[in-house]
């Protein structure tokens, strides 16, 4: 009997509890949706899976305790909201300012609200399907709906999402660890040394930290890492808001001899023109005259308006410091996939639901409403203030953009270190369910093998390292995974499972019609986004020197 199977779940009342008395040791360890596809862990019954579940997630509980198909939930409403918020929050927040820069503020807000509302509706469909289908496992719902192909489809979508998550975390290490090393060692951008090279660093971190952690048979630190990840993202948003009011526009050129931007009203400032990759015309940047004196530049041309920081700049006819409200270009195609990537939490909804104390669909829907709304606010703040800091110069990974104006800044350094620790500890958590699912599909009912355990982890880490080294920018990971697996998990799979498994409603009922429309919208999003992204790859090939 599958430990998470609920034979009688379809008679559970919507507004009443289906759980019994509470038992100790709440389920507090669900990670990021980009961290773990929990369904594959619960579905597996091999020794590794059982060890992972009983030691890594369920504390002192035995797996046998879940043999009761109607086992009681133990996790409070508040902790469930925290767990789901943590499942939603991930590396996708770092790409939202880039999405706003390529859609405009108003269009981005409309799209953000739309994806959030559609995610809530998707959770509603998923919860109802789980009730009617009698299972709290994503792959099992696929199997009940379409047999083996449905199970494989769910497995591939969840695995792709987790591989994309692993790659995005390794990209963050590739981007941010060199900046931390440069800050501590006082190095300039291009010194020719090997140790600030992000490609080397991700290999060293993978071999020295990620692979050893991935060889553990259980990950008991998951709950602590999850809480730390969410805390560091809150800190990240706070620093983004704070830095908006410190960094002037146009962006001054970083003076490496000083190490930070320091503005002095008594110093003469020269305006120089530097190319702006994201716009057709140039952007006005500032240079300190005491360090650089561009030939042929008239000192009188440096006069202009005075910012509160004391930085003078020359007004330009095409002012780059004005926010754009509606933007459409080739990079706009990445907006919806980035947003979809940021809101994926659906593989974790059902495990969190199964552990909710006094659970009901209505209560779990409220948990989802609170969690998604909270993350919506954080996403909007991070995107808006990040965009209003850099405008058209924003990077596809927001933290990396601050390297343009700082080499050593304590708040940013703290954020970078916190994010680096969080993502480094999270990569093994993402790898665990992928390995468990691969083991379940390829080596069913085989005894645990350390050799297989090691080889699967090593191959997955090696493939992700190659991917991160070869792909020049994180936006392609956000874009491709968001347009494919994230769209499948948010739109397509919940809708088709609902249409297939919920039998008591006629196909012409408003609920089924709504699910059908939702499915069509998801297919359009998926095909449209993938087509536009591929066109962008063809006509605007990646610039390898971008990072």
UniProtKB/Swiss-Prot annotation:
UniProtKB keywords: Amino-acid transport, Cell membrane, Cell projection, Disulfide bond, Glycoprotein, Ion transport, Membrane, Phosphoprotein, Sodium, Sodium transport, Symport, Transmembrane, Transmembrane helix, Transport
Ranges in the topological domain labelled Extracellular: 1-104, 173-195, 242-332, 391-411, 475-476, 536-547
| Role, per record | Symporter that cotransports neutral amino acids and sodium ions from the extraccellular to the intracellular side of the cell membrane. The transport is electrogenic, pH dependent and partially tolerates substitution of Na(+) by Li(+). Preferentially transports smaller amino acids, such as glycine, L-alanine, L-serine, L-asparagine and L-threonine, followed by L-cysteine, L-histidine, L-proline and L-glutamine and L-methionine.
Citing just one GO molecular function, the answer is: L-arginine transmembrane transporter activity
Q: Which PANTHER family does the entry link to? A: AMINO ACID TRANSPORTER, SODIUM-COUPLED NEUTRAL AMINO ACID TRANSPORTER 4
Q: Where does the entry annotate site (Influences on amino acid transport capacity)?
A: 232
Recorded catalytic reaction(s): these are: L-methionine(in) + Na(+)(in) = L-methionine(out) + Na(+)(out); L-asparagine(in) + Na(+)(in) = L-asparagine(out) + Na(+)(out); L-threonine(in) + Na(+)(in) = L-threonine(out) + Na(+)(out); L-serine(in) + Na(+)(in) = L-serine(out) + Na(+)(out)
- Where are the bilayer-spanning segments? 105-125, 152-172, 196-216, 221-241, 333-353, 370-390, 412-432, 454-474, 477-497, 515-535
- Spell out the post-translational modification annotation for this entry: The disulfide bond plays an important role in substrate transport, but has no effect on trafficking to the cell surface.
Task: Output this protein's name.
Answer: Sodium-coupled neutral amino acid transporter 4
Provide the positions where the record notes the PTM Phosphoserine.
Answer: 49
Annotated Gene Ontology cellular component terms = microvillus membrane
Glycosylation sites recorded in the entry for this protein: 260, 264, 276
Give the family, as the similarity comment puts it: Belongs to the amino acid/polyamine transporter 2 family.
Cystines in this chain = 249-321
Where, per UniProt, does this protein localize?
Cell membrane; Cell projection, Microvillus membrane
Give GO BP annotations, semicolon-separated. Answer: L-alanine import across plasma membrane; L-alanine transmembrane transport; L-arginine transmembrane transport; neutral amino acid transport
Q: Where is this region: Disordered?
A: 1-26
Regarding the membrane, this protein is recorded as: Multi-pass membrane protein
Topological domain ranges for the Cytoplasmic compartment: 126-151, 217-220, 354-369, 433-453, 498-514
């Amino acid at each position: 009997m599958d430990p998470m199977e609920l034979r009688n779940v379809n008679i559970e009342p919507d507004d009443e509890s289906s759980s019994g008395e509470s038992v100790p040791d709440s389920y507090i360890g669900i990670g990021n949706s980009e961290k773990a596809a929990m369904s594959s862990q619960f579905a597996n019954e091999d020794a590794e899976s059982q060890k992972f579940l009983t030691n890594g997630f369920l504390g002192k509980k035995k797996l046998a305790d879940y043999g009761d198909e109607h086992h009681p939930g133990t996790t409070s409403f508040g902790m469930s909201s925290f767990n789901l918020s943590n499942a939603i929050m991930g590396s996708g927040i770092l790409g939202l300012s880039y999405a706003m820069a390529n859609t405009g503020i108003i269009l981005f807000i409309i799209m953000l609200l739309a994806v959030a509302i559609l995610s809530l509706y998707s959770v509603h469909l998923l919860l109802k399907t789980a009730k009617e289908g009698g299972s709290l496992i994503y792959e099992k719902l696929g199997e009940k709906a379409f047999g083996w192909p449905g199970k494989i489809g769910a497995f591939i979508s969840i695995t792709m999402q987790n591989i994309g998550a692993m790659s995005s975390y390794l990209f963050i290490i590739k981007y941010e660890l060199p900046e931390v090393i440069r800050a501590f060692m006082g190095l300039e951008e291009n010194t020719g040394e090997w140790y600030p090279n992000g490609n080397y660093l991700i290999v060293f971190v993978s071999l020295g930290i990620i692979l050893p952690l991935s060889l553990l048979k259980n990950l008991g630190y998951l709950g602590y890492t999850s809480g730390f990840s969410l805390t560091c993202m809150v800190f990240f948003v706070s620093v983004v808001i704070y830095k908006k009011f410190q960094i002037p526009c146009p962006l001054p050129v970083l003076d490496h001899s000083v190490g930070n931007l320091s503005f002095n009203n008594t110093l003469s400032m020269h305006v120089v023109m530097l190319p702006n990759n994201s716009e057709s015309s140039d952007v006005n940047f500032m240079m300190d005259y005491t360090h650089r004196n561009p030939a042929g530049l008239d000192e009188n041309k440096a006069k202009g308006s005075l910012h509160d920081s004391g930085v003078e700049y020359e007004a330009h006819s095409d002012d780059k410091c004005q926010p754009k409200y509606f933007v459409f270009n080739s990079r706009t195609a990445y907006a919806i996939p980035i947003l979809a990537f940021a809101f994926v939490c659906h593989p974790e909804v059902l495990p969190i639901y199964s552990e909710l104390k006094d659970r009901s669909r209505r209560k779990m829907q409220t948990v989802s409403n609170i969690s998604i709304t909270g993350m919506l606010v954080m996403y909007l703040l991070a995107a808006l203030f990040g965009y209003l800091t850099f405008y058209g110069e924003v990077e596809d990974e927001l933290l990396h953009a601050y390297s343009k104006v700082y080499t050593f800044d304590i708040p940013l350094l703290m954020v970078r270190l916190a994010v680096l620790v969080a993502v480094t500890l999270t990569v093994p958590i993402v790898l665990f369910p992928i390995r468990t699912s691969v083991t379940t599909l390829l080596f069913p009912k085989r005894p645990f093998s350390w050799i297989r355990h090691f080889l699967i982890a090593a191959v997955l880490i090696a493939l992700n390292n190659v991917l991160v080294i070869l792909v020049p920018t994180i936006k392609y990971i956000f874009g491709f995974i968001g347009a494919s697996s994230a769209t499948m998990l948010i739109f397509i799979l919940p809708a088709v499972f609902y249409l297939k498994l919920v039998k008591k409603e006629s196909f012409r009922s408003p609920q089924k019609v709504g699910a059908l429309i939702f499915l069509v919208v998801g297919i359009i999003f998926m095909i449209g986004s993938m087509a536009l992204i591929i066109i962008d790859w063809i006509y605007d090939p990646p610039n390898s020197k971008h990072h």
